């Protein structure tokens, strides 16, 4: 299997070479600034206790607080999270927004959990990574198998520990909790804009074109509809 972290570092090396990047800066930007691995217990509905493993990685904070989602999937790995955090640094820099790159995840198949178990896992995981997150430090949004409901649990957990409501600790919240309208379609709409601009550069007509979409989740399904 392809190691995503090895791929990300290869991409970085190619870009750094082309940019003639200072050797010291290469060493700094080639590795994540922080990697946190947590193992935490969750009480299941049948009374048993399972221990789950989760990660939060901050690749670079030079431009501002880390930005990058938290995913729930049985194939989550530290190398995957590190690569995604590095790519988030690049994405935020390319579009010129004042954020760094981060990413997180838990090794779990959420489809096998009840709503009560999912809430318990979400609240405990966010408690474990709380030392890294915050409105001025690291602001997670949803990702694979996480949504506005999970973000509301994250926000509520952080707010309880802070002693006051902190809506800015996550994005992708429900509208009723200060979320943004259009957030659900944002990733797919960004894809639409990128496709449109790429077609303009390549001088290819968008109307009548055939498009292949990989994946049919929140991004792929909505992108297919918009395209």
Write out the residue ranges for each language-model feature.
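Short, Gly/Pro- and small/polar-rich lid/capping loops
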Residues: 2-39
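N-terminal Rossmann-fold NAD(P) dinucleotide-binding loop
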Residues: 220-221
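Aromatic pocket-lining residues of Rossmann-like dinucleotide-binding sites
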Residues: 227
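Glycine-rich, N-terminal phosphate-binding loop and its surrounding beta-alpha-beta segment
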Residues: 38-110
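Charged catalytic carboxylate motif
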Residues: 11, 80, 190
């Amino acid at each position: 299997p392809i190691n995503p972290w090895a791929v990300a570092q290869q991409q970085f090396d190619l870009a750094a070479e082309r940019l003639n990047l200072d050797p010291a800066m290469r060493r700094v930007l080639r590795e994540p600034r922080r990697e946190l691995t947590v193992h935490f217990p969750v009480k299941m509905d049948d009374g048993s206790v399972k221990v789950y493993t989760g990660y939060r990685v901050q690749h670079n904070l030079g431009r501002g607080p880390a930005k990058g989602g938290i995913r729930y999937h049985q194939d989550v790995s530290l190398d995957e999270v590190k690569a995604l955090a590095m790519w988030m640094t690049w994405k935020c820099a390319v579009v010129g927004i004042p954020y760094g790159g981060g990413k997180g995840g838990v090794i779990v198949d959420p489809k096998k959990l009840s709503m009560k178990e999912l809430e318990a896992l979400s609240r405990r995981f966010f408690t474990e990574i709380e030392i890294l997150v915050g409105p001025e430090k690291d602001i997670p949004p949803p990702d694979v198998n996480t949504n506005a409901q999970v973000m509301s649990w994250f926000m509520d957990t952080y707010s309880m520990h802070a002693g006051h409501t902190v809506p800015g600790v996550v994005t992708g919240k429900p509208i009723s909790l200060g979320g943004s309208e259009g957030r659900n379609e944002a990733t797919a709409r960004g894809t639409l804009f990128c496709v449109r601009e790429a077609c303009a550069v390549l001088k290819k007509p968008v109307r009548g074109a055939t498009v292949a979409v990989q994946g049919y989740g929140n991004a792929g399904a909505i992108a297919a509809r918009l395209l």
